[in-house]
Curated annotation (Swiss-Prot):
This is WD repeat-containing protein 90. Residues 257-278, 316-336, 1053-1133, 1151-1178 are annotated as: Disordered. Belongs to the WD repeat WDR90/POC16 family. The gene is wdr90. GO terms for biological process: centriole elongation; cilium assembly. Residues 320-335, 1114-1129, 1164-1178 have a biased composition (Basic and acidic residues). PANTHER family: WD REPEAT-CONTAINING PROTEIN 90, WD-40 REPEAT PROTEIN. The keyword Repeat applies. GO terms for cellular component: centriolar satellite; centriole; cytoplasm; microtubule. InterPro entries: Beta-prop_EML_1st (IPR055439), Beta-prop_WDR90_POC16_2nd (IPR055441), CFA20_dom (IPR007714), Quinoprotein_ADH-like_sf (IPR011047), WD40/YVTN_repeat-like_dom_sf (IPR015943), WD40_repeat_dom_sf (IPR036322), WD40_rpt (IPR001680), WD_repeat_EMAP (IPR050630).
Amino acid sequence: MAGVWQHPFVNVFKHLRLEEWKKSSKEGDVTSVMDKTLKCTVYRIRGSIPAGNYIQLPKTSSQSLGLTGRYLYILFKPLPGKHFVVHIDVSAEDGQTVRISFSNLFKEFKSTATWLQFPFVCGAIKGSVYDSTAQGARQGMVGPAPSGSRWTCLLLDVQYILSLYLSRRYSHLRSAKLCSNLLVRNLMTSDLLFNPEVNFMEARHAKTLPDGISPMPREMSFPVPKGEKWHDLYDFIMFPSDSSKLPYDSIQKGQSMVTAPGAPMSRSPARERPRSVTISKPVQDRVSLIQQITTPRPMPHRSLLRVESVPERPVSVSARAEEARDLEDRSRGVEQDGGVHVYAHKTNKLSIHRHKSDSEQVICTKVDRPETLSVPPECKKLLPDPIFNLRRIIGFGGCTECFALWTHTGCSVVYPCHAIIVVLEVKTGEQRFLLGHTDKVSALAFNGSCTLLASAQTGSLSMVRLWHFQKGSCLAMFKTHVHSVSYLSFSHSGTVLCGVGKDGHGKTMVVVWNTSQASRSGEVAVLAKAHTDIDIQTMKIAFFDDTRMVSCGKDNVRLWRVRGGTLRSCPVNLGEYHMLEFSDLAFEAGHRPEKEAEDRTLYVSSRSGHILEIDYKNVVLRNVRRVQPGQQQHSERRDKQTFSSGPGIAINSLSVSATFCATGTEDGYLRLWPLDFSGVFLEAEHEGPVSCVAISPEGLRVLSCTSSGELGVLDVPSRGYNTLMRSHTDTLLSFSCHPTHPQLVTVSSDNTIRIWDTGTLQQLYDFTAEEETPCAVTFHPVRQAFACGFSSGTIRFFDITATALQAEHKQHRGAITGLLFSPDGSLMYSCCSLGSVALYSIGHKEQHVLRVLGNVVCKDSERGPMALSLSSDGRLLAFVGPTEYTVTVMDARSLDELLRVDVSILDLDSTTLDCALGLAFSPLKPHHLLVSTSGNKILWLDPKTGRLTREVTQVHKQCCSSLAVSMDTRYMLTAGDRLLKVWDQRQPGTVRPQVFIGHSEAVQQVDFSPDQQSVISAGDAVFIWDFLAAPDPEFTKTDCVPALPFALHSSAALDPSSEHRRDSTFISSGMPRGTAPRPCISSPPRLDISPVQGMDHPDLFSESDDGQEEEGNRDEQERTLVPDTRDNLVESDEQSSVVIIECQPNRAKLLTGSKSNSSSLREGMVKSTHEPPRPDSYTHFHTRFKASCLAKGMCHPPEGQEMLTLRALIGYNGNGRANMAWNPDTGFFSYTCGCVIVVEDLHSGSQRHWLGHPEEISTLALTNDALVLASASGSGDGSSLCQIRIWDTQDGSCMKILTHHRTEVQAMSYSRDDRLFVSIGDYRDGNLALWSTKGYELLATSRLFQPVHAVTFNPAHFDDFASAGPGAVSFWRIETQGTDTQIKVYRVAVPEEVGTAAELTSITYNSTSLLYSGCSTGQVCVWDCQTHRCFLTWEADQGEIGILLCRGNRLLTGSNTRRIRLWCVAAVQELREKGSGASSTSVLMEHEMTLDGAIVSATFDDALEMGIVGTTAGTLWYINWVENTSIRLISGHRNKVMDLAVAHGESHCATCGEDGSLRIWSLQSCELLLQFQVLNQSCLCLAWSPQPKSGPSTEDQRIAAGYSDGTIRIFSVSKTEMEMKIHPHPCAVTSIAYSTSGDVLLTGGKDGQMAITSPRTGMTIRVLSDHKGSPITTIECTGRKLTGLPTDGELWLAASTDRRVSIWASDWSKDKCELLDWLSFPAPTSQKDLDVSVPTLAAFCPWQPGTVVYSGFGVEKEILFYSLIQKQVLLRIPLSHFATSLTLSPAASLIAVGSNERLLRLIDTSAGTKQDFAAYDDGVHLCRVSPSGNLLLTASYNQVLVWDIQNS
């Protein structure tokens, strides 16, 4: 009955009256606050150390709560960005106490007999970024609680936990300890299972809950506002979960307690198998589609599809790194709680935010495609882990130089180096480290066997750590109760530890701990402690008695003893020496059996030089001696030291062995004395006072330490001295590594400059400045010399080999804050704290000052090594200034200002101004400038434009003091306060940085070693880390060595070869994409697609119809040029016969013909229907007008030596008809784009390309077994034959080429048994051909009365097929007699109800020989094939029906209204049989979808449930009627592609088209990622802003595009919106480019005028009219500065159609723009030869600086290389055709040339070879090589081809 009072529940906080803190305790930062969400008071526990900030229930651990409830409810909320720990102590029935802990600090589940540790998964706000990225993340989402953490009701089934994990029976709850960082509302125990979603009040009005579940008590429930759902606001976690699918090794959110009947169970993210591909919702739908449509399956069935789970959309999120104190928590938590491991919980919704179009109809649309399929959404671990390994430390001491210990073997010494304990092997010099302290180590002590090491940490977090010395593991860590421990002493047995320090009031405090259990349980208990007013310098435990201690200090020597839990002491009567200041003590070593253990001498040393000998047993002073300095007899000889009563020398340390005594004194001497102190028998002089001496265990060596930072060993027998370590004695300020020698130079506040050997850690040289502090230092990159800047403003140049000062510069008045050499060492740069910067010329013998600028650098002396930064190519110099808010970039050769960036305005959301603290250039081009700011950010700026390309936020809690980037730019190092962080810059935001501790002071500088194999950090000491992700050493030797500029004299000359890798076409070197913009559900809005009407229907034209009408007119003109081939037709038709039967409404006429007269009949048809009118139907194929023509010959590349391979093709030809094929059983999927057949693997997205057609492919036909594909292309202008190619789908080989039709092929079809194949020509051809698939022999032909739009075989009768055309349907019958084949046709006119003007545009059979036909009026007619009559019509659409598919009782219609509809036609069969007596006379529309264009192709499965549909917009859609979803599979441009550009990084490209669309594509998957649509305008040119981007983060990138109305629009890619609209031109903008700095936009118009516009303000700076009257075709910029030109500005060129090229030099920062050169190229004298379609092309040559490459219309077809310096043509490359596009590779001497003859030519200028590639059906009007030279992108009308450049 004792537990009756606990029923039904116990409110623990109320039970203990927590607010009174009488029955409970709190420690640290625990406060009560009002929570707005819960609307009540809660307790907030926060602090850096969980063990020091907590609520303890009950007050002491010896008490017990005694709560017997099975379930423990904890209502809490983790604090965002922090870790928390909760400990629950429970008792089992056998009396055993078990601790159950859960924390988001734990990495994995751990279990012992008395402790269970569970990782905890923090929930986030529903729909937040963390919530969406946490799906399935088990290994990656390690870290603190997310920013959107929620209130959580955690239900622990304590009884089940003990039973499940430890097989124990639960008794009661003893205690609970809630540790920082969290908010807690209450705790509750009960035997009842409560549902937190429902409280008692709600339960009264609601339905009954399931059995065994009760409503949550009101005082424990969470409030839910009206209209909200509980689970949208809070998390409920039951552990262990009742779901078998949730893991038992972590505490995480599962499903709701009350589950609807039949609802599927949610899957555990922790138990899901790792996915090889993590993709967004639309593409997961596509993958689901692929799985369905590529998997062979049985016959169709009508069961509904069920979706088990809906995939989530991944959103990249930047990981928040752990900061200094968080890491301190972790360092403690490693011993207590394990590591960090987070499981992410699932949710099932993600908010999609769409951007609205603005007032001028700019539609910014995201396409439902992810960027890639390989980037996981969770935040991944940076690998390798750890990426650093601490290898060497240069340093000693820190807090103290009084502790250095021998190990028991004498092989190693142990000493502190600030916060690190170093174990140094004496012989080899190898180091190992004991890591864990976060502040300076103030004391060390070994036990007698050296198995245990005790170390004390000073500072506000004073603590003691006990170490297992051999393993290097920390056994225990505990508070010292004193502010700082100054001395530690271990007993010989290791069971007692004594510590001395000062308390908070400055009083001396002695604490004695019991460490006997430390090795087993990690518990350390305080035996005794005492406060005293006496001074204690040294205190040691007697090695013969663990309870006795001796101390000495100022005016005292005392004996101590621990007894009965108290610590008592008594002084030693020193008589007249009681006023001395005692410094150290030592017991007599050894033991004689005849004596008692305590009968020995105690030696005590003093600051006055005295050594006292005390009888320890009798506490009597025996003898006093004093060491005094000897007289200087000679300058090089010193008399032996003796003891006398004269003035003494301070003794700092004392060590006694069995045979001698060692003393370390203030005069810098280590002296060895015999035990009778008769005289010194050996001494060693040091540079500073000796602070510590220690005799080795064998007594043959003496370890000595000095206060000047020297650690050494004196070998007594050999009298040799070995310096083990030297160290700076104050903070290091800067360091520099020599590029070729293993040397490191450091400067420190101790006024010394030291040079170290990084291999041996030995100090090589030491330079001392007495009255000034060295502030900055840098090695000369070539010579054995270095420069050092001092606090006085002086810069000194030292020659190391001569150890001499070579030069001294005094141009500065303030302390030197920055000092750098140029990469070749010919220039030196310096800046000072008073704002001046200087440039020096450094020669081998002389050094000169070239330029000094004042008040340009921020006046701040705290910037240190990051004050100046130089790009690796030596061209750009950057610094913070002239104010702390600005960063200035200068020309490093002349100190001319190039750019000034205000970093304070880059963060628009910040309420404070951001200051720049330091900067660094990235090593590789484009040499991003990294700026650290006071807002704890790293800004990646484009050094040419100043644009922010990337931003890393929350880098450190305090300001970043140093940063560096690896040579391959993948890794970034940052230092802040005492931490080092490593960031992966290839995947920013997706990989957590690694954090490294060890420094006890702020890290002043961090950098990679020159060979990239190590990382060096300096602050309190020099840390050398092994970089485990170091690149291949060959990379640093070849790729990363910068090109060195020429020596600077009077003017800065430009190196013409240093930028040989830059792309000549600036448009091609746009920004890279870290992550693609998130796609939205809706597809881009498209304009209506209506058929090309006659001139009498102007109202049906859309904005794009003008072009179609023009094309139609051109087609009419072209039609008159087609030769009459009737004679050939007659000859070919003699081999077959045809019987034509025409049926009219009122009469029937039978025409029969034999084989002899069929030719005359056909000839009459040809004559009567010569030049038929063009059908007014969108279904009929009309080849696009092409002004290009096929080349007569080409240079085929040798087999196997092709320089180009076709990687991918972007686009689908929406102009084709039925030009897509898919087999649902085999998964074969193909479509056409131009003259190429693309076969795509729907699993991987990989493409195969079947080439061979010379013209645009009009249609495809796939056999029923999907083994053979037929494709047809036309004859174009008559120069090529119309081809039907037969392909083997297995290997892609062309088996046969059929030539029969003279123009285009409109439709093709295979019979049901694949024995027959029929092809029908277009309206100009008018022929039907029947083929046998066995050898593809022509069986029969027929001349058609009228154009035919569609043909299809009857699936029920292999010899029947039907065709449809204007006003009639034709039923064809094939009759075979022997080898003769005859075709009979019965032609039936459309019913009068449909109208005589209607055309039948599409047909399809069902399985019972019913024929459905679609009409141009939108009606569907149903025909009985046996009686040839139409018995049913209905209006299925408002437009022309171009697609019909029938499967069973379902019919699909697709029309030019962009709609597809699914009909139930079950009543049609009954109407056919019963007529008006049928029970149902109606058809029902089941579904409807509207797509982005008129429907031109469709293929569905046998149940018409899912399929693929193509539209005139160039899109292929996946349609699923069951789920009523449509997903884009393939996208493309509908109209001509006007321009394209490749983004930096080559993961994306951008294209723009005549339809006003600007599209961004993934080059890996060829998927459309983003589309900007401007209505009623054409987008004619585009350019990426010049800031590159390498990863997914929140920074922006922009694209500028020029339009036909003269406007320029600048679009933000990440924001998916238009940022600015500029109108600098009165007519169309034909060319656009960013300047290399990004400060201005250069645009050219159709009128020949060029505008210089600021993309920031939108203002037009100037207008250039030099090309007025001729449209601008090309504008290109280059940042290369050329030697020999009379200017040093940025170069750019412009070309116009009048064959003129202007070369300009501009300095936009100075508003300079000068015409440098003017090139005019001659044209043929005859006007009739003038070809306006040939553009003028010009570009800068990347591999020949100062050379312009030109091609255009002229006397000869050629490419010219013109030298701007020599003013002459250097090279002429002849061409076979005029070039319509031109691009040059930045990586090799390759030129790609496109021509109007549909050829792409690749010319290797170095080898003199050329290769032609034909994969186009129109002229190649665009060519772009990617920035790296690996990819070539070309465009031909609306198709974009991506080529791989081989051996580039």
